[in-house]
Amino acid sequence: MVQRWLYSTNAKDIAVLYFMLAIFSGMAGTAMSLIIRLELAAPGSQYLQGNAQLFNVLVVGHAVLMIFFLVMPALIGGFGNYLLPLMIGATDTAFPRINNIAFWVLPMGLVCLVTSTLVESGAGTGWTVYPPLSSIQAHSGPSVDLAIFALHLTSISSLLGAINFIVTTLNMRTNGMTMHKLPLFVWSIFITAFLLLLSLPVLSAGITMLLLDRNFNTSFFEVAGGGDPILYEHLFYFFGHPEVYILIIPGFGIISHVVSTYSKKPVFGEISMVYAMASIGLLGFLVWSHHMYIVGLDADTRAYFTSATMIIAIPTGIKIFSWLATIYGGSIRLATPMLYAIAFLFLFTMGGLTGVALANASLDVAFHDTYYVVGHFHYVLSMGAIFSLFAGYYYWSPQILGLNYNEKLAQIQFWLIFIGANVIFFPMHFLGINGMPRRIPDYPDAFAGWNYVASIGSFIATLSLFLFIYILYDQLVNGLNNKVNNKSVIYTKAPDFVESNTIFNLNTVKSSSIEFLLTSPPAVHSFNTPAVQS
């Protein structure tokens, strides 16, 4: 056991470790968000005894856990490691031992993050860690330093993983698997890896300067010494904006596969989908200052960032309409993954529309730092990244585990989280339009109604997550019985471009990507000879 899981160099085992870490961190992050919502359920101090610092520590804990320890490990580390080698017919990733260390620095980062909340009064800086609030004057203990170390460790992990994915995709494709034949999920991980490679060094530079400012008396962000805190914001958001595309692009890849399968049609405009993802990735580097409209940028700078941000809506629109064109006229089967995919389309579009409002520099003067922004990015993350994560889990887990989940329970879980998430985040737009600020644990009585509604929604969503944990348990215990009761996903695959040959176990099935042609669960080493792409 220790040999297999601690020293593992097998991409599939490492992927399972990533999933376990992601589920654990997701539970912790959800618990924090529930405490936040309980505190905000009514005006006045509810649970935190008026401790605003603790409230902000919960906010930063919730944010960092959900972003760096749930979405990225699950979508990139989990699905990426498991499926990318299978889909291109590779034996493993290019650097199996780098893969191992890339995982094992994450638990260390988690330890640093938890420790930072426990020493002194915690890092109450918000996930952006802006100086001067994060400076040694305002946060005197080691909390912020530990949070910076946590971010450094997750950066190292993601960089190593990104290098691994890029080299694997370029060098280890099977015979006949040209770049034009790559499945869309592989493309999405490939593009995400480039984004990580280009943006993370800038974040590391910024937080290292902050570390030096705090402990070694430099003044990068210290006005008294000729520094400028705005420099930190530029460095942080040059990472922070590509980061949100890093979180969602693997989701795009998953949704493409799910929509194709359950409509029984190839994806509409596959090459255009790849170019759209690449354009989104490229443009993501050119728009960072739309997070900073109110720091005193020039009018022409604000005009540029407004226009550039709106241009991102074009490739995003191409993707949405291509998915709709894939569904249109298809033979649609509303299995759980397809429900998540359709919900993703509606809610991600909704989040994108509020984003178009926020892109305007003049409107953002009113919206900045209000709950309108919180509503916007939780629509695209909670109902974009997380819904695609669930879609991918329900789509691939029967193939990965050889065990089926209970379809009826899974659909109940979908409707619970669909209703819950909307009830939480839709009212936040109203609160933001009325000027309720973010990161504040108390508010005037006028905001009480919608906050109460949002807090009820968080209970519904949390209930659905408890149900998901039970579905996992049921899948592992009763998976074979469920397989008899559910029609498995494999018989509804879209007839597409990959022919099976003798190395596959199911010679009758045609599939748009190789992974469903293997045994279920796949062998520890899937391809001892190169797979052949027709």
From Swiss-Prot:
Gene this chain is encoded by: COXI
Molecular-function annotations in GO: cytochrome-c oxidase activity; heme binding; metal ion binding
EC number per UniProt: 7.1.1.9
Residues that coordinate or bind Ca(2+): 39, 42, 44, 441
Binding site for Fe(II)-heme a: 62, 378
Source organism (scientific name): Saccharomyces paradoxus (Yeast)
UniProt similarity note: Belongs to the heme-copper respiratory oxidase family.
PROSITE patterns to which the protein is assigned, alphabetical: COX1, COX1_CUB
List of residues binding Mg(2+): 368-369
Residue numbers binding Cu cation: 241, 290-291
Cross-link (1'-histidyl-3'-tyrosine (His-Tyr)): 241-245
Classification via CDD domains: Cyt_c_Oxidase_I (cd01663)
Designated name of the protein: Cytochrome c oxidase subunit 1
Organism lineage string: Eukaryota, Fungi, Dikarya, Ascomycota, Saccharomycotina
Signal peptide limits: none
Pathway(s) per entry: Energy metabolism; oxidative phosphorylation
Compartment annotation: Mitochondrion inner membrane
Function description: Component of the cytochrome c oxidase, the last enzyme in the mitochondrial electron transport chain which drives oxidative phosphorylation. The respiratory chain contains 3 multisubunit complexes succinate dehydrogenase (complex II, CII), ubiquinol-cytochrome c oxidoreductase (cytochrome b-c1 complex, complex III, CIII) and cytochrome c oxidase (complex IV, CIV), that cooperate to transfer electrons derived from NADH and succinate to molecular oxygen, creating an electrochemical gradient over the inner membrane that drives transmembrane transport and the ATP synthase.
Top EC group: translocase
Catalyzed reactions: 4 Fe(II)-[cytochrome c] + O2 + 8 H(+)(in) = 4 Fe(III)-[cytochrome c] + 2 H2O + 4 H(+)(out)
Segments traversing the membrane: 16-36, 57-77, 101-121, 147-167, 182-202, 235-255, 267-287, 310-330, 338-358, 372-392, 414-434, 452-472
Keywords: Calcium, Copper, Electron transport, Heme, Iron, Magnesium, Membrane, Metal-binding, Mitochondrion, Mitochondrion inner membrane, Respiratory chain, Translocase, Transmembrane, Transmembrane helix, Transport
Residues annotated as binding heme a3: 376
